[in-house]
């Protein structure tokens, strides 16, 4: 059962929501436009506001549902964590798109809302604060990722816990997926949320 949960979580994460929306609404391949990501930000810039919101909600749901399914069928915290990271892996490296997907932000948020809604909401709140102040989605995502393990530590009160370690791994993964954005931010070339790339 555990193997099935993990495999199903990866397939759920692999659902190429942004790619399908781009193809259906504008007949474009988001992998070849803008940032090349199939996530909500690239959808926002190249398809529209409401499609981007739809993609964000579905991508968030992939991480949340994967963990909730694991929680329903098993009481093993480690399986919950592996299910969540499997959904994130599917989102970043979807089998249907030959491994070219999103940057794990929305799916990661969904995962942590399921593991600890307080940590998830704290990360989302900080993301929105930075976004409101700077208008940079990438900077907001990176900032929230950096604080994610800190929020998790204060929630747990200890380092030695699978939730803390997975928060650290996801944070590093999100930062790594934004490495080109970091370069553009340092050069002053990064696009704001209301600008095309």
Curated annotation (Swiss-Prot):
The gene is plsY. It is found in: Cell inner membrane. Keywords: Cell inner membrane, Cell membrane, Lipid biosynthesis, Lipid metabolism, Membrane, Phospholipid biosynthesis, Phospholipid metabolism, Transferase, Transmembrane, Transmembrane helix. Belongs to the PlsY family. One of its GO terms (cellular component) is plasma membrane. This is Glycerol-3-phosphate acyltransferase. Its main location: membrane. The keyword Transit peptide does not apply.
């Amino acid at each position: 059962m555990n193997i099935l949960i993990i495999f199903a979580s990866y397939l759920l994460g692999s659902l190429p929501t942004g790619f399908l929306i781009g193809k259906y609404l504008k007949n474009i391949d988001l992998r070849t436009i803008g940032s090349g990501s199939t996530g909500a930000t690239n959808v926002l810039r190249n398809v529209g506001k409401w499609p981007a919101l739809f993609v964000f909600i579905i991508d968030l749901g992939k991480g949340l549902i994967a963990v909730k399914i694991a929680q329903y069928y098993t009481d093993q915290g480690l399986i919950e964590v592996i299910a969540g990271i499997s959904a994130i892996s599917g989102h970043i490296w979807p089998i249907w798109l030959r491994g070219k997907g999103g940057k794990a932000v929305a799916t990661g948020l969904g995962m942590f809302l399921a593991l600890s809604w307080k940590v998830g909401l704290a990360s989302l709140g900080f993301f929105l604060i930075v976004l409101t102040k700077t208008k940079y989605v990438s900077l907001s995502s990176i900032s929230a990722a950096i604080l994610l393990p800190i929020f998790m530590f204060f929630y747990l009160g200890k380092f030695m816990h699978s939730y803390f370690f997975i928060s650290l791994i996801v944070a590093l993964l999100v930062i790594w997926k934004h490495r080109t954005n970091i370069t553009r931010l340092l050069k002053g070339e990064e696009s704001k949320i209301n600008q095309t790339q």
